[in-house]
Amino acid sequence: MGLTKTLEEYIKMYEKHTKEKFQFNTSFSFFYHPEHGFCEYKIEDTGLYIWQLCGDLKYWVDIGYKVCQQFQLPAMSAYILRHSKPFIRKLGFKIVKTEHEDSYYRFTCKNKAGEELVATQHGDKYIFVWKIEVKDNDSTDV
């Protein structure tokens, strides 16, 4: 069993790193895990949307992939308030294309499986969008 934190401890950590006051977003569902942090999310036809997140990013992204597969969602996006390049590396992606225009950067990334992630920076905020290859849930393969 890993290191656990209370929700209050994760919220303090979130506020310290983001320099923003944490407030529950009533438009999103909320999930907390003592070893992995917390995540606010919303499921819509167009994809899975992750709003406020603190803790183990890799854990929450892995959960997100599973949710996208289960509900056959084509994309997952996350709002990130920290520098994007360390997150890109931690998630196993490499930047294959960089675009810069005015006050934003966009990084197109791929991982070893060929999956795509686009990270767009505007000021200090980042939007990560993963394209999800939906697997056929009706497959009879054993």
Indicate residue ranges for each PLM-predicted region:
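A conserved beta-strand-loop-helix scaffold within acyl/acetyltransferase catalytic domains
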Residues: E15-G47
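Short secondary-structure junctions
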Residues: E20-K21, F28-F31, G92-E99, L117
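Active-site beta-strand termini and strand-to-loop segments that position acidic
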Residues: H33-P34, I43, C109-K112, I132
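Short, surface-exposed beta-strand/loop "edge" segments at domain boundaries and coil↔beta transitions
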Residues: F38-C39, K58-W60, S84-F87, E115-V118, ...
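Acyl-donor binding region in acyl/amide transferases
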Residues: E44-G92, V96-D102
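Secondary-structure transition/turn motif
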Residues: Q52-L57, N111-K112, H122, W130-D136
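Conserved catalytic-core motifs of GNAT/GCN5-like acyltransferases
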Residues: K94-Y126
